Amino acid sequence: MRDMRVHRRNGHVWLCCLALFAAACTTAPPRGTLASPSAEILPTDARAMAYGATTAQVLRNSEMADKVRALFGPDWMPGTPRAGQMLVPGAEAYFEQGAMVRLLRIGGTDYIAVSGCVPGNCDSRHALLLIEVGGGRLFARLDEGGFVHYYGYGSEGVMRDTAQLIADSGYRALYPPGSRYQRART
């Protein structure tokens, strides 16, 4: 009889633990916390090529060049660590080895995805630039060997709250867990 009570009590403890675990997995984030938007890769069309077909073409495009430099600010050019600059090689180096331009939909908005990496160091130093179709807002994520930098250009309030969420959603769509860049980060 005693063994049966012990088994029943253990069963109740296990059931309570399972219920707590399940509740924790389905609990909404705290109020005021923004959720990452969903992202998907779209077929490449004329919108994706609006500023060029390759990373180099997009960065040299007359409509985008100044916006990209403004996006990264003092981090664009190589230099030594100084006030206001986070990247020693400069963000420009992260796009030297570029790829073809892609089109993503993140949270219902379409973005041109421009990616690149530092030659010879692509597994740990790579970048993703997202240009909202129409060119109004830009987001970027630069992976610097385990440390990630985020950038936003456009409406200040929107950038501060969403740059990381949008850039990370785009990154996860292009490089799902187990991909080359994801393996390098873990």
What is each of the regions a protein language model found here?
Residues R2-L15:
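Bacterial N-terminal signal peptides that target proteins for export
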Residues L34, D45-T54, V58-F72, W76, ...:
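C-terminal partner/receptor-binding element of secreted or periplasmic proteins
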Residues R31-P43:
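N-terminal propeptides/low-complexity segments immediately following signal peptides
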Residues F21-A24:
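C-terminal motif of bacterial Sec signal peptides marking the signal peptidase cleavage site
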Residues E40-A50, G90-A93:
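Short acidic/polar alpha-helix capping motifs at helix-coil junctions
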Residues T26-A28:
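Bacterial signal peptide processing site
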Residues P74-A140:
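Mature extracytoplasmic domains of secretory-pathway proteins
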